[in-house]
Amino acid sequence: MPIEREYGVDENAFLVSKTDTKGRITYCNEPFLNIVGVKQGDLLGKPHNIIRHTDMPRIIFKLLWERIQNKEEIFAFIKNKTLNGGFYWVFGNITASLDQQDNIVGYYSVRRKPNAKAIEIIKPLYAKLLELERDGGIEASKKYLLKFLEEKSTSYDEFINNLQRF
């Protein structure tokens, strides 16, 4: 099924989901369910990557997993697919959920409407990263991303957060 129709995230909505340590969905709120186009029971226990859009470079998720497995938060612009053939962009914050002994027990994601100007900058970057991954694997896209950030004299976090505030 082609993924062509774009759905916009409501300005005031927060799309919330929680997963276990393997990335299987344990909770999602109504705004998240509504945009994905399913009922709660349809997603519980399913891998969160069920909504991963094919336009997303793997390097972004590699960076995401490295960060959250080290108990560090990460912000990212993410293009997800709906389960009815559409897609939507979000500005997401993903963190590890910890127990009282500081062990990771799952992951928590809060996503909101991204800055439209930021998405126009992110789209060609992600397209380039995807192209590099097809030709040279994830290491090629990682190398490009690091060089891209270095040329801008910024870190990943600064770049992403500044785009959202842009």
Where are these regions (language model features)?
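Sensory/regulatory domains in signal-transduction proteins
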Residues: 3-129
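Juxtadomain coupling helices with adjacent low-complexity linkers
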Residues: 105-108, 112-166
